[in-house]
Amino acid sequence: MSEPASISTGVAARYATAVYDIAKDSKSVKTLEDDINVLQGALAESADFGALIMSPIYTREEQEAAISALAAKMGLSATMANTLSLMAQKRRLFVVPQLLSTLREIIAEDKGEVTADVVSAKALTKTQADKLAKTLKASTGKTVTLNASVDESLIGGLVVKVGSRMIDTSIRSKLNSLQNAMKEVG
């Protein structure tokens, strides 16, 4: 991991832990989840919002005023709105995407859930997804939510990532291994 990425991940983790603890103490974890969904939707849909949190051009005051107005318009909880304002004051808004993903991980961990990123050559059927989730639940001991995507370059098979574990059963991976083995021999 590069140094800037590890720094922003560390900053995001500290804010996420603090926000989660506040939400848990005030029994508003569900509200926090709603805030995360709203903010992730805004980041995905609005390039201007992304530019606001990433750009060093805006002053602390401009960022804080804009974030406060946006938080009110989005209907964010006081905890999240105050956190974003504090992050603007400290010039830390650039870690908001990592903050949101870290918060999701903390909430899932607390609920005994885990998200598995599954990449397949073609879309999984409902039966296949259910069977895979059941198998992963037996392996991890946690409720598994699948985040499925399609990559036709895999040719066949799956690539499954659960936390730091990755299982690659794709045809592409097997062909690459075979190609490397042939290079070593010849």
UniProtKB/Swiss-Prot annotation:
Q: Which domain of life is it from?
A: Bacteria
Location comes to:
Cell inner membrane
Q: Name one Pfam family in it.
A: OSCP
Gene3D superfamilies with a match to the protein in the record: N-terminal domain of the delta subunit of the F1F0-ATP synthase
Recorded GO CC terms: plasma membrane; proton-transporting ATP synthase complex
Q: What keywords were assigned to this record?
A: ATP synthesis, Cell inner membrane, Cell membrane, CF(1), Hydrogen ion transport, Ion transport, Membrane, Transport
Topology in the lipid bilayer is annotated as: Peripheral membrane protein
- GO MF: proton-transporting ATP synthase activity, rotational mechanism
Q: Name the protein family.
A: Belongs to the ATPase delta chain family.
Assembly and partners are described as:
F-type ATPases have 2 components, F(1) - the catalytic core - and F(0) - the membrane proton channel. F(1) has five subunits: alpha(3), beta(3), gamma(1), delta(1), epsilon(1). CF(0) has four main subunits: a(1), b(1), b'(1) and c(10-14). The alpha and beta chains form an alternating ring which encloses part of the gamma chain. F(1) is attached to F(0) by a central stalk formed by the gamma and epsilon chains, while a peripheral stalk is formed by the delta, b and b' chains.
What this protein is reported to do is described as: F(1)F(0) ATP synthase produces ATP from ADP in the presence of a proton or sodium gradient. F-type ATPases consist of two structural domains, F(1) containing the extramembraneous catalytic core and F(0) containing the membrane proton channel, linked together by a central stalk and a peripheral stalk. During catalysis, ATP synthesis in the catalytic domain of F(1) is coupled via a rotary mechanism of the central stalk subunits to proton translocation. This protein is part of the stalk that links CF(0) to CF(1). It either transmits conformational changes from CF(0) to CF(1) or is implicated in proton conduction.
Looking up PANTHER family in the UniProt record yields: ATP SYNTHASE DELTA CHAIN
What's the protein here called?
Answer: ATP synthase subunit delta
Native species of this protein? Roseobacter denitrificans (strain ATCC 33942 / OCh 114)
Lineage of producing organism: Bacteria, Pseudomonadati, Pseudomonadota, Alphaproteobacteria, Rhodobacterales
